[in-house]
Design a protein with these regions (language model features):
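Short phosphate-binding loop-to-helix
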Residues: 1
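Short aromatic/hydrophobic "clamp" motif used to bind/position activated sugar donors
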Residues: 4
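Active-site acidic Asp-centered loop
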Residues: 7-8
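Glycine-/small-residue-rich active-site loops that bind phosphorylated ligands and cofactors
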Residues: 12-13, 125
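Conserved core of the sugar-phosphate nucleotidyltransferase
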Residues: 14-84
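Residues that scaffold the ATP/ADP-binding catalytic core of kinase and kinase-like folds
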Residues: 62, 88-89, 136
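Left-handed beta-helix
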Residues: 84, 93-187
Length: 188
């Protein structure tokens, strides 16, 4: 395959990777990074990297979010590039240090490679600890947020099983919850 798309398992978002790849090819960039503009980077996304972008959406830096700015471009650890370039970057990172990440080597190459950013629109969450996991789940209780993530034309394939409906006892007090079937809810 001529191109590779790298995406993490701890970022929650929806994107058409075919369109992302097409945008990369049309731009002529060496590497295209996906980012999400946020206005709460002082409190959230503190374990994520942020991008420094120029006016043409060219990436000038990839640095840790130190929580010193409210508005940031959070790097979603998602990128596309040619397979040969990916392999050469990984080899170079390995030769430099066993602690080097792909983001580290890309940051080193910002001046020599054409690295561009593409903005992501819609629901986005970075799940790196229990508080961010909880916050993402609570955000998805909002119907608009859930619609941004789950699209009608993109079905979710899951394994179903037959179980009885959830049973709510008289003492149950349930608010802001998504409840699966097969449960018995009581309040003691």
């Amino acid at each position: 395959h001529p191109y590779v798309v790298i995406a993490p398992s701890y970022m929650v978002y929806s994107i058409d990777f075919d369109q992302f790849l097409h945008t990369h090819i049309e731009s002529g960039a060496d590497v295209t990074l996906l980012y999400h503009a946020v206005d709460n980077a002082k409190e959230a996304y503190l374990t994520c990297n942020v991008l420094g972008l120029n006016r043409q959406k060219g990436v000038e830096s990839i640095e840790p979010n130190h929580g010193n700015k409210k508005n940031q471009y959070v790097y979603m650890d998602t990128c596309v590039m040619k397979t040969e370039l990916f392999i050469s970057l990984i080899k170079e990172a390995k030769n430099l240090s066993s602690m080097y990440t792909l983001a580290d080597i890309l940051n080193d190459k910002c001046e020599t490679l054409d690295i561009r950013g593409v903005a992501h629109k819609g629901f986005f969450a970075s799940i790196t600890d229990f508080p961010s996991y909880y916050a993402a789940n609570m955000a998805l209780l909002n119907y608009k947020s859930a619609q941004e993530l789950f699209h009608d034309n993109w079905p979710i394939y899951t394994r179903t099983n037959d179980s009885c409906p959830t049973q709510y006892f008289n003492t149950a007090d349930v608010k802001n919850s998504v409840i699966s079937n097969g449960l018995s809810l009581i309040h003691i």
